Amino acid sequence: MTLASQIATQLLDIKAVYLKPEDPFTWASGIKSPIYTDNRVTLSYPKTRDLIENGFVETIRAHFPEVEVIAGTATAGIPHGAIIADKMTLPFAYIRSKLKDHGAGNQIEGRVLKGQKMVIIEDLISTGGSVLDAAAAASREGADVLGVVAIFTYELPKASQNFKEAGIKLITLSNYTELIAVAKLQGYITNDGLHLLKKFKEDQVNWQQ
């Protein structure tokens, strides 16, 4: 079983991911979605957490061997990033969504040196907007952002476009395609449900029609 499949299985088992193609969720953007993900739940399950953190370490070593600092996005990327940095014996920092409005007014907490090669950790990629904002903030502070590694992606076309335009490499440990395949195999969804989930990936607005 691949790492992507193992993680998809774990996310379903611990209910970090819910699939309701016949009774969709409403995202903050207003989009009706057949999937809801809360990867913060993974921190409460040691087996799942270890699988994810070890997957992060292996992926970073394979794709970004020159990394010098790990950064987590606030807030979801912070615990994962801190664990990864500890496992890799690397410095750690975290990136706020906006400048702090008191004290030193930092957006990056921790010490990042000019030109230091950084990998940013995120838990979930939808459109990628927030983590790309974090990458831009890190670059402004002088970091050399090598790429972003995340637990899971919805594989939305908008995300691919955004990362391409930003020139930032994205790697995820698991993905929507893998998850719905595992969900069907393990009986979480019906054939009709799988059909709707595939339609959502193709067209997030008209998938129910």
Swiss-Prot record:
Orotate binds at residue 126. 5-phospho-alpha-D-ribose 1-diphosphate binds at residues 96, 100, 102, 122-130. Catalyzes the transfer of a ribosyl phosphate group from 5-phosphoribose 1-diphosphate to orotate, leading to the formation of orotidine monophosphate (OMP). Homodimer. This is Orotate phosphoribosyltransferase. GO terms for molecular function: magnesium ion binding; orotate phosphoribosyltransferase activity. It catalyses: orotidine 5'-phosphate + diphosphate = orotate + 5-phospho-alpha-D-ribose 1-diphosphate. It holds the Pfam family Pribosyltran. Its EC number is 2.4.2.10. Belongs to the purine/pyrimidine phosphoribosyltransferase family. PyrE subfamily. GO terms for biological process: 'de novo' UMP biosynthetic process; pyrimidine nucleobase biosynthetic process. Its cofactor is Mg(2+).
